[in-house]
Amino acid sequence: MFKTVDEAIHFIESQRTKRSFEDFQKIIERYQIPIDLKNVIHVAGTNGKGSTVTFIKDLLMKQGYHVGTFTSPYIIKHHERISVDGKPISDDDLLRFINQLLPLIQQEHLSMFEIDTLIMLYYFNELDLDYHIIECGIGGLHDKTNVIKSNVAVITNIGYDHQFMLGDTLLEIAHHKVGIVKENVPLFTTEQNKEILSYFKDYCTKHQSTFYPLQVEKQYQYPYHLHFHQKEYVLHLPTYQVSNLTLALNVVDYLCDLNDEDIQAVIDDF
C-alpha cells in the first residue's frame, strides 16, 4: 500500500514489463475488469492524436456532455493521462485506485501503460460519463486499449512510427492502426494516401463498418479557412490543425448536433 501519490506514481512509472495483447486480454477476462464504457471514441494515428482528442472533447463539452479522456504521454504530470472534462484525476483517486489494484498489479507484473489502462477503466466506470475518448498508445490492433469496445474509430493519418513494432511500410503500419475498427464500428480518417484509403475501405467492408474518408481543404494563406455545414470558419491556428479540426467536427457531428456558435467558441479557445 502506498501512503502518498508520489510514491504510487514512482512505482507506476518504474513498471516496464513487456506482454502481448492476447496475454493482457486474458488478464482482463480472468479478473473481470470492467471494459464496457458507453460512447467510446477510439483514436489512433501517427500525428495529431492529441489535438484531435482535445477538439472532440471540447466540442462535446460545449454540448453539455461529461467526457473522459485517456491520452499519452503526459505534459506536466502523470495524472493528465486520465482526465474528466479536462481535469486530471485527483491525487486521492489515483492513490485509491493504485492501492485497490496493487495485488493484481504485483501478481501479474503489469506495465505502466497497462496499470494506467486499468485505473482509467475503473475510474470512468465509477463516474458514468457521457462520452469516452481513448487514445491508442502504439499502433492499434495490439494496443492495450483495444480491449475496450468502441462506438467510433478515428485514424488521424499514417506515417512512419514505431517501425520496430508496426512494420517498415506504410501499409504494414496502416494494418495495425486500422485494427481498432471492430464489427459495425464506423471509421473516420483524414488520411489522404489513396493506397492506404483503399486498404481502409476494404477492411471496413469486411467488418461491415461504414467508412468516412474526409477531404482536407488545402490552405495557402494565413489565417486559414475551414468550410463546414455551409459556413466558413476563420482559423488562427497552424495549418496542420485544419486536418485535426476537420476530423473532430465530423466525428462529433456524427454523434450529436453541432451549432455554429459552439464550433467558433472551440476554435477561439484552442
Give short role names for the model-derived ranges:
Residues 264-270:
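Short, intrinsically disordered, charge-balanced linker/junction segments flanking boundaries
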Residues 131, 135, 152-232, 241-263:
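Acidic, Mg2+-coordinating active-site environments of NTP-dependent enzymes
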Residues 56, 120, 198-200:
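Aromatic/hydrophobic pocket-lining residues that form π-stacking "cages" and hydrophobic walls in ligand
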Residues 22, 51, 89-92, 96, ...:
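Conserved active-site and cofactor/substrate-binding residues in soluble primary-metabolism enzymes
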Residues 1-45, 52-54, 58-65, 70:
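Short functional linear segments
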Residues 105-109, 233-239:
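A short glycine/serine-rich beta->alpha loop
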Residues 1-5, 148-149, 254:
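ATP-dependent carboxylate-amine ligase
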Residues 28-29, 33-36, 62-148, 164-166, ...:
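ATP-dependent carboxylate-amine ligase catalytic core
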